[in-house]
Amino acid sequence: MVASLSYQNGQKARSHPLLSLAGLIELPPSPLFGTDGIRGQVGELLTAPLALQIGFWAGQVLKNQAGVTKPIIIGQDSRNSSDMLANAITAGLTWAGIEVWQLGLCPTPCVAYLTRESEAMGGIMISASHNPPEDNGIKFFDSSGLKLSGTLAGQIEAGLRGNLELADNSVNWGKATFCPELIQKYYQAVIASVGTDINLSGLKIVLDLAWGAAVNLAPLVFQTVGAEVICLHDRADGDRINVNCGSTHLESLQAAVINQQADLGFAFDGDADRVLAVDSQGRVVDGDYILYFWGRSLLEAGQLPDGLLVATVMANLGFERAWQKLGGQFLRTAVGDQHVQAQMWETGAMLGGEQSGHILCHHYGVSGDGMQTALHLAALVQKSAVSLANLVDHSFVTYPQILRNVRVEDREVRRNWQQCEPLRREIRKAETAMAEKGRILVRASGTEPLIRVMVEAETLELANFWTERLVAAVRSYLL
């Protein structure tokens, strides 16, 4: 029997023995769910008792939505805390009567793909993406492999806060099975997405695997299609995941590409849902360039309806104007791949992504996939018969763009920063002064305790000037 759920109108529900754990858990007053599930420092926000309850309520909510009981798939990255959180969530899910298929170490897009292809009830990934090792997170996917809607996330949180009641309290234990063999299906799908005739022989590629989720699969993918592969940070290491490596620290990849005289390199983040590239000269090829190259290829093949690309407010003006010169349309969304995804579904766009390297191509799937993106870019380089460096040279010139982060520990201050009128006044002053010469974006990070300040201008001098002014204002008014 599938339990039905109801809200308690402010009354604490006490309809299941699992709620006896509530005394062990102190939840922050602000919402647990951010832009990418639940994320925080392990031992503070994220604990085993909380993960147990998250598993239980996620199982109840997904079961109620589906109307039937099907398995839930769980994957994880290499963090030291990932085993603990995965097992605690599994315990909660099986308490809710859900069958669990555990994949072990795998990329986030693997969970999304297998959830969709196996018609599972949902998927869960234990990862804090690009965050440092002491953090971790819990990402949720619905049966379509899409990130969980705000409505369903809100229901899970209502259960955690004791504001959701089960109409049926009967207990039917679920079973947990370790199924790493399922990962092979994802590996095959990634290669199949570029066609069976792909051959990257002659390309020397450096992969920075960030001590994370891609260490087993990414080298195998590129070796299978004929590339010469050199790997950095290529073991699962929970102490070093993302530390001075991966997509947020490209220095070691840049040096390796130059020293090894490689054609190009790719850097993944901890869960491999995003990727950045480096050309043979050591220059960073970010998500804007990747979207431009892949988009132009699809446009020339007649596979990009209305020439439409979806990017975010972080996308460089140089990229936008270059794309428009090709005759394409360019839409911007708020930061976050879930916002890009929503705009793509709404408009029918087939390609979108973020400067940070989250790229979504609906021709091949519904989630951002670092390995798939890297493979398609490498195939595009091979097909073009010119180097990635040459493609960059003949694409577009970026406007100087500076991004600075200000650490703000107070969660409520970060959440309500836009109510700070003196800071808003400083931002308006900067926007007026910049006029058509650039852009300003101040926002709270959805995944880290940071206020991000981005200034883009026609000259580096102008960008530096207003960045320093705004960073000083954030520190003055929010700290």
Swiss-Prot record:
Cofactor-binding details, from the entry: Binds 1 Mg(2+) ion per subunit.
GO cellular component: cytosol
InterPro entries: A-D-PHexomutase_a/b/a-I (IPR005844), A-D-PHexomutase_a/b/a-I/II/III (IPR016055), A-D-PHexomutase_a/b/a-II (IPR005845), A-D-PHexomutase_a/b/a-III (IPR005846), A-D-PHexomutase_C (IPR005843), A-D-PHexomutase_C_sf (IPR036900), A-D-PHexomutase_CS (IPR016066), Alpha-D-phosphohexomutase_SF (IPR005841)
Cofactor needs: Mg(2+)
Any Pfam family hit: PGM_PMM_II
E.C. number: 5.4.2.10
GO MF terms held by the record: magnesium ion binding; phosphoglucosamine mutase activity; phosphomannomutase activity
Free-text description of this protein's post-translational modifications in UniProt: Activated by phosphorylation.
Catalytic reaction equation(s): alpha-D-glucosamine 1-phosphate = D-glucosamine 6-phosphate
CDD domains: GlmM
One BP annotation, GO: carbohydrate metabolic process
Catalytic-site annotation from UniProt: 129
Keywords: Isomerase, Magnesium, Metal-binding, Phosphoprotein
Positions of Mg(2+) binding: 129, 269, 271, 273
Sequence positions bearing Phosphoserine: 129
EC category: isomerase
Disulfide bond annotation, renumbered to this chain: none
Similarity-based family: Belongs to the phosphohexose mutase family.
UniProt xrefs under NCBIfam families: glmM (TIGR01455)
Function, in words: Catalyzes the conversion of glucosamine-6-phosphate to glucosamine-1-phosphate.
Stated name of the protein: Phosphoglucosamine mutase
Origin species: Microcystis aeruginosa (strain NIES-843 / IAM M-2473)
Record lineage: Bacteria, Bacillati, Cyanobacteriota, Cyanophyceae, Oscillatoriophycideae
